[in-house]
Amino acid sequence: MSRVTLSRYLIEQTRSNNTPADLRFLIEVVARACKEISHAVSKGALGGVLGSMGTENVQGEVQKKLDVISNEILLEANEWGGHLAGMASEEMDNAYQIPGKYPKGAYLLVFDPLDGSSNIDINAPVGTIFSVLRCPNEYLSQNEALNEKAFLQPGTEQVAAGYAIYGPQTMLVLTLGDGVKGFTLDREMGSFVLTHEDIKIPESTQEFAINMSNQRHWEAPVQRYVNELLAGEEGPLKKNYNMRWVAAMVADVHRILTRGGLFMYPRDSREPSKPGKLRLMYEANPMSFLVEQAGGASTDGHQRILDIQPEGLHQRVAVYLGSKEEVERATAYHKE
């Protein structure tokens, strides 16, 4: 039986589910960019890509060399194809305008070019997260210049989302709104090959992922919930839990998608003005879309993340996502 490549899968989606051809081409371009990023990451010290740039992004975070390289790869790969009206990235203050010399398309691409970049220098997993939205009609008609407002759509408006994880294997995990598929990069073929046909998250779990070093800063409902997890069989949840933490959302969520679990990055008291650490548009929304399509759930502790109306490109939110039973329990504690 022949193997199903990403290209073949997308063509079949165009035939059977009426996936627009432009969306298919866009996903293929993003996948090619991810292959290039994977190659750059794998070179490590041999490619002179380790270390920091000495600059900060809009988040106030020190930029790693590979942050900047990955951002440029995604911009250059996607700006000329005619599928996009614009792009937005964690590494850029403002929306990226498609240069006038290139045709414009009907979609918007939002991405974190290299999630978990603090892991680069220690050779731990990192990844690329992306989200695809339709561009509002008023910006397509040229009546309005593209600006940040075009991107400020709730996660329910996503038409596709996914991530690439660069670890022992490079994988692309994708949803077009009809389940979740996983593709593994065959380096001999140079193609992503379908290896995980229908990714599903178990409803219950015995694993959770959270940065325990922040415990003293958490709100009371989070303290209560995590203490119950740690209490194990003797506690109110009546079972033992294991904690895992990779310090890269893409790696922690990948584990949850493949074997279940709960990922938490709650708000804390260090910066009361910030409702969370993770960015809504290019981290929480695409990951929440994937998790829900895999049968899981995702909230900010109070409401479904995909229902949040964004107020800014770099808006932050608290995140609880993964196995439905545990997400619902953690969310219920916030409402008591």
Curated annotation (Swiss-Prot):
GO terms for cellular component: cytosol. Pfam families: FBPase, FBPase_C. One of its GO terms (molecular function) is magnesium ion binding. Substrate binds at residues 115-118, 211, 277. It is found in: Cytoplasm. It catalyses: beta-D-fructose 1,6-bisphosphate + H2O = beta-D-fructose 6-phosphate + phosphate. Its EC number is 3.1.3.11. Mg(2+) 1 binds at residues 90, 112, 114. Binds 2 magnesium ions per subunit. Keywords: Carbohydrate metabolism, Cytoplasm, Hydrolase, Magnesium, Metal-binding. Its cofactor is Mg(2+). The keyword Cytoplasm applies. One of its GO terms (biological process) is sucrose biosynthetic process. Pathway: Carbohydrate biosynthesis; gluconeogenesis. Homotetramer. Belongs to the FBPase class 1 family. This is Fructose-1,6-bisphosphatase class 1. It comes from Pseudomonas savastanoi pv. phaseolicola (strain 1448A / Race 6) (Pseudomonas syringae pv. phaseolicola (strain 1448A / Race 6)).
